[in-house]
């Protein structure tokens, strides 16, 4: 026997609720009124058009939107980005060396740009930037240049007359260079000094003569590597990838950089 509870719903055994509602989102072809019924905490296997219960897994979608969309587009995008990054790293012969080659340069530039956001003053920013620039200079000169493009340079002071001699090494003729790693190496090598030239000009325009010390040191270290590897690539004419990257990309970037001076 049915009875009416305090909330105005008709119920027969205390756990089944019948709700009759009319809404344009639930209209059918035969009637403007549609019945949705369900048993709380149970599975409803009736033949009604729309039936389900809270906790039964059917009829009412409480995790997604009202129209039944799953909303998994964001996870798919992140998964695609992650898989693309992994595939790109697998295509590199020396992924760690390529990452280090970019990491120190990018870290020094970002630290110089956003030092005010981290509450660091000039002294702390100066020390951290010099450390990052020194790590970058050493790693490029001795590690990443040898691994990514098969080139290495160094200079030595002659103890007899005090003259400074430069030495340029290239890999043997059978050494093959990964073209992606070669582009990463040369573009970052020639592109980084352009940012420091812009920072140098900004300090002059804004009369920040204390902060100008960081771009000067950065340019000195970066241009030493640019000169050394440029001479190495010219002496290794058999390496087509290094010759193209250093001659074409390097000269165009150096010409643009010299136009600012």
Curated annotation (Swiss-Prot):
Q: Where is the composition biased (Polar residues)?
A: 20-34
Q: Where is this region: Disordered?
A: 20-55
Q: Does the keyword Transmembrane helix apply?
A: yes
Q: Where is this protein localized, as stated in its record? A: Membrane
Q: Which InterPro entries match?
A: TVP23-like
Record-level GO BP terms: protein secretion; vesicle-mediated transport
Question: What GO terms fall under cellular component here?
Answer: Golgi membrane
Superkingdom per UniProt: Eukaryota
Kindly list the residue ranges recorded as spanning the membrane: 113-133, 183-200, 204-226
Q: How does it sit in the membrane?
A: Multi-pass membrane protein
Say which family it is in.
Belongs to the TVP23 family.
Name of the protein in its database record: Uncharacterized Golgi apparatus membrane protein-like protein 2
Source species, please?
Dictyostelium discoideum (Social amoeba)
